[in-house]
Amino acid sequence: MTLADRGDSLALKVLQMDYPFSGPWGSEMAEEYSDLARRIADVPGLVCKVWTENPGTGEAGGIYLFEDEASLDSYLAGKIERMKALGIEGVRVRKFDVNEDLTQITRGRISE
């Protein structure tokens, strides 16, 4: 389903999350976290995740697109608890609405 097919039945939401990270980076990160990525891919309501990393500033995180706010909030509650249990501190979390009309103009390829 594309943005044009969606209608107004769902309100897409974006989650931006980043935190201090000391590596691994690049392909080493991909190898180490591929199982986690597969589990995240199965999260209910998740459309996609873009993995982010910045070795220069020692940060990693992601940009997540969810079908709706309830799905985002459900994922976020569990994610924060898991990160705390792992001793990860300094997590920055921001939630955004998606302007679907402008996203279509700029070739946003959002599908479910």
What role is predicted for each listed range?
Residues 61-64:
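A short, exposed loop/beta-hairpin motif centered on an aromatic-Gly-Thr core
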Residues 80-88:
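A common structural junction motif
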Residues 1-59, 69-77, 90-112:
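Short S/T/G/P-rich N-terminal loop/turn motif that feeds into the first structured element of a domain
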